[in-house]
């Protein structure tokens, strides 16, 4: 039995879970998310707990068991608390500013780089070098934050670029001088 998959999921007050065949919908204070459960996995609801079960011990069923349980738990946490990734920009002249719901980055290129917010994602600019990406879908928040970081990855020699808050950059030693 999957150690993660066998744990029951408690549904907090104010969250409505709807099972419709293989589609599970979670509705909460922050919004609504839905997910299609893969075929061998079954989800059952008893009052305020959800249980994820698998019919057999095939490799595919075992791997989907823990995954499905975690995805449903992430959906419930997303509609109650939401998710947030903080990013910081390091480098002379590197900055970010909000243009409506979009962001405009100056990252040392010859042109400003614009990033528009996908549906369900909000950007909060906390200063010229700090921003946060927030939303209810954990995967989408992580993907948008990773795409922003990809615009200018941290340089291993000077550490300049876009990084996650608290991320430690492995530094390299430059070439030896005379």
Swiss-Prot record:
One of its GO terms (biological process) is cytoplasmic translation. Keywords: Ribonucleoprotein, Ribosomal protein, RNA-binding, rRNA-binding. One of its GO terms (molecular function) is structural constituent of ribosome. Transmembrane segments: none annotated. The keyword Transferase does not apply. GO terms for cellular component: cytosolic large ribosomal subunit. It comes from the Bacteria. Disulfide bonds: none annotated. InterPro entries: Ribosomal_uL6-like (IPR000702), Ribosomal_uL6-like_a/b-dom_sf (IPR036789), Ribosomal_uL6_a/b-dom (IPR020040), Ribosomal_uL6_bac-type (IPR019906), Ribosomal_uL6_CS (IPR002358). Part of the 50S ribosomal subunit. Belongs to the universal ribosomal protein uL6 family. This protein binds to the 23S rRNA, and is important in its secondary structure. It is located near the subunit interface in the base of the L7/L12 stalk, and near the tRNA binding site of the peptidyltransferase center. PANTHER family: 60S/50S RIBOSOMAL PROTEIN L6/L9 (PTHR11655), LARGE RIBOSOMAL SUBUNIT PROTEIN UL6M (PTHR11655:SF14). This is Large ribosomal subunit protein uL6. It comes from Paenarthrobacter aurescens (strain TC1). The gene is rplF.
